[in-house]
A protein has these predicted regions:
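Bacterial N-terminal signal peptides
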Residues: 9-20
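Extracellular carbohydrate-recognition regions
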Residues: 23-44, 208-223
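Extracellular beta-strand elements of beta-rich domains used
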Residues: 31, 195-199
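Short tryptophan-centered beta-strand motifs in secreted/extracellular beta-sheet-rich domains
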Residues: 31, 80-82, 138-156
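Short carbohydrate-recognition loop motifs
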Residues: 45-64
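Secretory/extracellular carbohydrate-interaction modules
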Residues: 59-123
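Short, aromatic/His-centered strand-loop micro-motif at the edge of beta-sheets
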Residues: 121-144
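Flexible glycan-contacting loops in extracellular carbohydrate-active proteins
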Residues: 164-195
Length: 226
């Protein structure tokens, strides 16, 4: 019985180390600290951290595109997940990837009530609408994109809804995309709010937040904030 207990403890320790390793290879943003904004760059509009949320607050109207600053082109395969909620009708809200500039990026988002994969290449915009996925505002939803080379698996609320390939943009950072129409009055958290933004993939270094999660016995990041 004693040996069985030792084997159990050993297996538990190994499993814990594996969880720690997997957790460490990720950029994690819980937006609980205001200085996390310094790791992001606004390409259009203005994003702010308010009440532990990443919020699109620009009142000028138009797109709000923000990306992680210190992104390396060799990080080509990765998975992005984030919680998000739209706070206004007739707006955009979601995530962006392969972000090079305001005229060149991909996004997985709601736009005017429809869930879409949108490409911006050389300033030209092409929409691919996901049928049958209605927009729900002011409730937390989950976006996920699994990026492998030029193939993108697009998930929403845990379900794979579409797999697409696109060759135009081979590199670029990851971030957020939203849109607020000019003159629209928004609340304290703006047109959209995001939380628990996570990018995990080969070569991506651990962030400070993932180190903190190690001290919490490798509880998964999704379970840290509910």
């Amino acid at each position: 019985m004693k040996r069985l207990h030792q084997v159990f403890v050993c297996c538990f320790a190994i499993l814990s180390l594996m969880l720690l390793y997997n957790t460490s290879q990720a950029l994690l943003f819980d937006f609980e600290k205001a200085d996390q904004i310094n790791q992001w760059k606004d390409l259009a509009g203005k994003m702010e951290i308010k009440d532990g949320l990443f919020c699109s607050t620009s009142a000028a109207g138009g797109p709000l595109v923000s990306m992680i600053k210190d992104w390396k082109d060799e990080w080509s395969d990765y998975t992005i997940t984030t919680k998000a909620q739209g706070l206004i009708g007739d707006g955009d809200w979601g995530i962006a990837f392969r972000v090079q500039d305001i005229a060149n990026h991909y996004s997985w988002q709601f736009c005017n009530g429809s869930l879409m994969f949108i490409t911006y290449v050389g300033g030209g915009r092409v929409e691919s609408v996901i049928q049958g996925q209605g927009e729900v505002l002011e409730e937390w939803q989950e976006y996920k994109v699994d990026v492998k080379g030029n193939k993108f698996d697009l998930y929403f609320n845990g379900k794979l809804l579409k797999s697409v390939t696109h060759d135009a943009l081979e590199t670029g950072s990851v971030g957020t995309f939203s849109w607020i129409n000019a003159g629209l009055v928004v609340g304290a958290h703006g047109g959209a709010a995001l939380d628990d933004f996570n990018v995990e993939g080969k070569g991506i270094p651990s962030s400070k937040l993932s180190v903190e999660s190690k001290n919490k016995l490798a509880v998964t990041w999704a379970g840290l904030k509910k």
